[in-house]
Structures are given as C-alpha cells and as structure tokens.
Curated annotation (Swiss-Prot):
SMART domains: HintC, HintN. The keyword Signal applies. It is an enzyme of class 3 (hydrolase). GO terms for biological process: anatomical structure morphogenesis; cell fate specification; cell-cell signaling; intein-mediated protein splicing; protein autoprocessing; regulation of gene expression; segment polarity determination; self proteolysis. It comes from Drosophila mojavensis. A lipid is attached at residue 86 (N-palmitoyl cysteine). Interacts with shf. It comes from the Eukaryota. The record marks 328 as: Involved in auto-cleavage. Its main location: nucleus. The record marks 305 as: Involved in cholesterol transfer. This is Protein hedgehog. GO terms for cellular component: cytoplasm; extracellular space; nucleus; plasma membrane. Residues 1-20 form the signal peptide.
Amino acid sequence: MDNNQAVSALWSCASATCLSLDAKRHSLEPSSPDGQASLDVNNKSAPVDAHARKLRHIAHTPRGSCFMALLLLLLLALNFRHAHSCGPGRGLGRRRERNLYPLVLKQTVPNLSEYHNGASGPLEGVIHRDSPKFKNLVLNYNKDILFRDEEGTGADRVMSKRCREKLNMLAYSVMNEWPGVRLLVTESWDEDHQHGQESLHYEGRAVTIATSDRDQSKYGMLARLAVEAGFDWVSYVSRRHIYCSVKSDSSPSISHVHGCFTPESTALLESGAEKALSELAIGDRVLSMDTKGQPVYSEVILFMDRNLEQVQNFVQLHTDGGAVLTVTPAHLIAVWQAERQTLEFVFADRVEELSQVLVHDATGELRPQRVLRVDSVQSRGVVAPLTREGTIVVNSVAASCYAVISSQSLAHWGLAPMRLWSTLQSWMPAKGQLRSAQDKPTPKDATAQQQNGIHWYANALYKVKDYVLPQSWRHD
C-alpha cells in the first residue's frame, strides 16, 4: 500500500469512527420535531460534506480533540515527502544501501604516509605511565570488544579519546556485519617498546585488530569497516591483522568538530547595520539566503557553538569582488555551478580557485563571484549562529549554518526540533515581562549571557552521525 492509499484508508476510517460516535450521541438526544433523528447514518444520499461536519463536531469534544491530534500526526507521517534542496546530498528519507568493497592486502586508506597531515599526522612523542600526557589517555571497557592483553597490565585498553571513539564505532559495525563475532584488539598503547622507533602505539593512537573468530577471510572487510568508522589511517598490513591509527586529540584539525566563523566576521542586520558575530544575540534578524538563492532576513534562534578563546585552523576564501570569508574547513559554503545552473553546498576546504560563491553586492542581490585564492589561516575564537532559515550571509558571502554533514537539507531537517522549540518559546511569556522594567536585560547583557562552548543538541547530533551516516556523507 502506498502513502496515498494509506492516507485515504486512514481518513475513511476516521470519518466512519466520527460518524458512529456522533450517531451514538444523537441516539441519546430527543428526536427532531418532524420525528426524524438528527442524523441518519444509513441515508446513502447524505451530502458528501457530512464527514467534514462530523469531524468538526468531534474536534470540539475533549476526547475528540485528542483523537484529531493523533489523526493529524498519522496523516503527516504517512504523507511525508522527501525534502528537495540545492545541496549535494541525496535528500531526506531512506538511505540507499551502499556496496562496501574490502581492502586488499597491503592497501592503505588514505594512500598517504601515516604521518601526513591528511592521514594521522606527525608523531608527538612517546607517552610513559609517568608522562604528563598519560592522564590524557583513557581506558576502553567496551563489552563488545575483546582485548588480548598479553602483558596482563591492561595496556591494550589504554588509548587516546579519538582512538576509543573510532574503536567503539568499529565494534558496533563488526557486530552488525557478522552477528556473533566481536572485534579483537591485539595491541593498543605500548609501554614495552615492542614496535619500531617511530610508532603511534607509543602515544595510544594506534591499534592492531582482528575478529574474535580469527577468520582471515573477513579481514579485508574489517579494514573497510575501520575506514567507515573514521580511523584516519587504515592498513591491511598482513593476513593476520589490520592496523589503524588516528590523529592526535590535540590536533587543530579535530580540536573543533563543528563548523564556525571567526568572532570578528560580520553579519548584516535587518536594520541595515553590520554586527560582529561575537556580539550577535538570539532574536537578532540577520541576512540569510532562502532555498531559491534569494536574500532574506532570518532570526538567530541559537548558537551551535561559541568559544572566543578556541584557537582553530580556518579556510579563507578571497573573491574577485574583494569579499573575504574565514570559516572552519568542515563548514558548508554555497557554491554556484554555472554549467548546471544549480546551487550546491560544499565543504569549505573543498572549494577550489575559480569556484563561484554567492556574494551580497551593492544592488542588494546575491550574485556569483569567482574565488581567486584559498588560504589556510589560524585564528582565535569560533562562533556558529543558527538562523531559522539554516543559512547566513557572513562578510557578504552566503554560507550554510551547518557543517560536518555534506547535505544541507539533511542537516536542516536534523535541527527541526530546535526550530520547533524556538517557536514554542516565542509563545511563552518573555522573562523580561516577569520583571520590572528596570530589571529587563539589555541587548548587551543578552550577548554576554551567551553559552560558552558547543550547544548540547549540536554535540548530540555530532556523536550520532557516525552511527547513521556513511563516511562519504561526513567530513572526517
């Protein structure tokens, strides 16, 4: 049964239920003066709009109101349609099954040196039990992982936070791929110097893994699952095990997991004034972009992140019109595809020279300008405002409010609960109305009261994404 048939059947069922309830009510009331009941449910010639009249009547009773609310929710759920967006994702709805191809012996992903910045990054130094950095390592007690622990010291459970995160993700994938089989860790942090002089095992950033059944035919796929889990470098190093490693927890490329702008970047208010992002407050209406690429003003409903002290790597885009946008690498930027006449959202670190971004010009329109130069810079402070529209124009350049996930429409859908909550809050009495006029906070006070750090909901979405989205949809 398709959605339309289901909706039709549900509506018919609801109508019949309402009619029967109404008939029962009228059977307990006096007849009309002409001796006929108010409603003859057996009358085949009754007007078609009788259903609507009865539904309206039922909706005015307490029980009927609950029934109608549930009915509406069911109708909305059954009549749900995929969202369309100019973003590059596949849209909302059911994810297509993807074919995962196992790695072959001696293959590495990515095909770079392990110590390259595009892989796990450079060595930072051996960590001993008495090293100051040892306290930054964590223990992994995941019951879905077997730790061989040949040394009997528990060292195989010791690892960096990022390594634990990716290992737990891999354990989940292994159980789904092979029911009854668990992930086996044969080596993690090494304090006995049993590896080469340069090894990330000494920093708790590397693991060697296998499956609990020791079935070597599974190891190629195990390596692929490790890639999907987000390990920064995976090697099918031998027929006996797989080697995986991660970036340092202090690496600038992962120290900030969400997309943000610099605090000194500016947004255009509806009043025509420009305001630094560090001074924006919830409720400000700023220039944004609608789904058709047209400029609109949209309300700031929350800050997904705000940290004025965080030192972070940024991508800096320079356009031929003089606009400069500084943004974190995983942030989505609106890019105009002239050949296809479409607008797509692309990760900032994947925007290339001669790409076209939308810039708010003197005419008040958003028009394409070519990117002349792409730089990498480091700066202090990150701010990530979320508008109701899901987009924002910063330093005159149109950008998404979202990052990490490649689909603008999917990210926007994921923040729907926060938009709903913001709407509900707008219906409630404002805090200022409960105080005297003298105590009402000023906009400057409201800005000062902004949260410091990642918003709890944005952080929750970040943690969930690895479980529900393939790596190709993520910026890892």
